[in-house]
Every structure is written in C-alpha cells, then in structure tokens.
Amino acid sequence: MSLQICILTPDRVFWNQEAEEIILPTNTGQMGVLTNHAPIITALDIGIMSIRTQKDWTSVALMGGFALVKQNQVTVLVNSAESKETINSSEAEQAFLEAKEQLEKALGQKEKVEANFAFKRARARYQLVS
C-alpha cells in the first residue's frame, strides 16, 4: 500500500503520483508521513518537501501552505512549488546571498519580516539545487 500525493498550486497540479513516504516542512519542524498515518491538517512553512517513491527520493521546494493527510491520501495546497530542474543554481545562490545580506541589514519590524520571508524562500530554492 502507498500514499497518493497531490501537490496543488494556484495555477496547476504540480505533482499527482504515488509515494511510499513523504517529509513535510511544517511550521513546527519536519513531519514524516507513512501509509496509514492518522488524519491531520497542518500548516506548511517555506522549505523542502521530500518524497520517496519506490525508486528514489525527490525533493520539491514549497513556498508555504497547508497539507491534509487522510486515508492514505495527502493533499498539499501551496502558494508555489518548484522542482530542481526548473531552478538555475547560480541564480539561486546569488538570490540566497542577497537575501541573507538584506536580512542582516533589516532595521524596522516590517523590513525584518519581509527580509525573513525573502530569505526563507531563497534558502529553500538554494538548498534544493545544492
């Protein structure tokens, strides 16, 4: 028995396949899901989702959202999702370094929140390709 994984973004179905295991980036840390997991709804943070199929592991950068686990079906609703193949590694590294610098320079509360969001997004994309 396996999990049916569906990753949805506002504009498309990003992933709709079976998997043996997933690891989700929740707001309270990483959460693993195997078959017959208890039903749960959880908020997702910006980060890397790992998916284990019968053959290998695949990673996807998620940009925040929610996940519903119920009866071996996992529905992931996210603002955006990216695969390794769609990200330019040098651009991702440059964006990560710039976001890190902006986070260090941020002064006001609003600036810090915006810089932290940009940093987390850039870090997820960079981690995916490195």
UniProtKB/Swiss-Prot annotation:
Its membrane topology: Peripheral membrane protein
Main location (coarse class): plastid
Keyword vocabulary terms for this entry: ATP synthesis, CF(1), Chloroplast, Hydrogen ion transport, Ion transport, Membrane, Plastid, Thylakoid, Transport
Coiled-coil spans in chain: none
Keyword Ion transport in record: yes
InterPro entries for this protein: ATP_synth_F1_dsu/esu, ATP_synth_F1_dsu/esu_N, ATP_synth_F1_esu_C, ATPsynth_dsu/esu_N
Entry-linked Gene3D superfamilies: 6.10.140.480, F0F1 ATP synthase delta/epsilon subunit, N-terminal
Subunit structure: F-type ATPases have 2 components, CF(1) - the catalytic core - and CF(0) - the membrane proton channel. CF(1) has five subunits: alpha(3), beta(3), gamma(1), delta(1), epsilon(1). CF(0) has three main subunits: a, b and c.
NCBIfam families: ATP_synt_epsi
Known function: Produces ATP from ADP in the presence of a proton gradient across the membrane.
Designated name of the protein: ATP synthase epsilon chain, chloroplastic
Source organism: Tupiella akineta (Green alga)
Gene: atpE
